């Protein structure tokens, strides 16, 4: 069974975008390609257990096993060597992607303290949107009592839109709460 947002895209979002931007072909209509979750764990250099906790939390949040990211080059000031594990990332596609986006928009973002909407300035000029979350506790899957320290994560929503305006309209149609 397809995800709720996937159905919503086919029935409402795609036709609305086609009408607003006057696309000639259905292949021109922007859609969400993937969502990438990245958690940088800088203190994993001194304590590898911190990375394991981050991987476990990212697994709970995303529903799939993260890829551990390695340092590309050595930096002496950070006591960092090339090839050391310093973070974790997950790429979501398909139904998992739509399920995560639904959860993010309707459950997790409203749990952020003093939430007034996400920034409209976080588009990259090519139709992709980046969102930073300061603490992982906004996700329901994370048990508050088992968290040793709060960690932030980056959420990148990659779309097939050519412009930021198209991507903003796509995410607005999905219900992304942009700040006024």
UniProtKB/Swiss-Prot annotation:
InterPro entries: Ribosomal_uL5, Ribosomal_uL5_bac-type, Ribosomal_uL5_C, Ribosomal_uL5_CS, Ribosomal_uL5_dom_sf, Ribosomal_uL5_N. Disulfide bonds: none annotated. Keywords: Ribonucleoprotein, Ribosomal protein, RNA-binding, rRNA-binding, tRNA-binding. GO terms for biological process: translation. SUPFAM superfamilies: RL5-like. Coiled coil: none annotated. The keyword rRNA-binding applies. Belongs to the universal ribosomal protein uL5 family. This is Large ribosomal subunit protein uL5. It comes from Lactobacillus helveticus (strain DPC 4571). The lineage of its organism: Bacteria, Bacillati, Bacillota, Bacilli, Lactobacillales. The gene is rplE.
């Amino acid at each position: 069974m397809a995800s709720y947002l996937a159905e919503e895209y086919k029935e409402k979002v795609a036709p609305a975008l086609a009408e607003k931007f006057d696309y000639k072909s259905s292949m021109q209509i922007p859609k969400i390609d993937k969502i990438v979750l990245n958690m940088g764990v800088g203190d994993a250099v001194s304590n590898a257990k911190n990375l394991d906790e981050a991987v476990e939390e990212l697994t709970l949040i995303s529903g799939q096993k993260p890829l551990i990211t390695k340092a590309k080059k050595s930096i002496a000031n950070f006591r960092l060597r090339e090839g050391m594990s310093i973070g974790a990332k997950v790429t979501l596609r398909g139904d998992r992607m739509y399920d995560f986006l639904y959860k993010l928009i309707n459950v997790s973002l409203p749990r952020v303290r003093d939430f007034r909407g996400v920034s409209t300035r976080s588009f990259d000029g090519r139709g992709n949107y980046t969102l930073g979350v300061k603490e992982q506790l906004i996700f329901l899957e994370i048990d508050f009592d088992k968290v040793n320290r709060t960690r932030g994560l980056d959420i990148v929503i990659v779309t097939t839109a050519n412009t930021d305006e198209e991507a903003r309209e796509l995410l607005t149609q999905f219900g992304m709460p942009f700040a006024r």
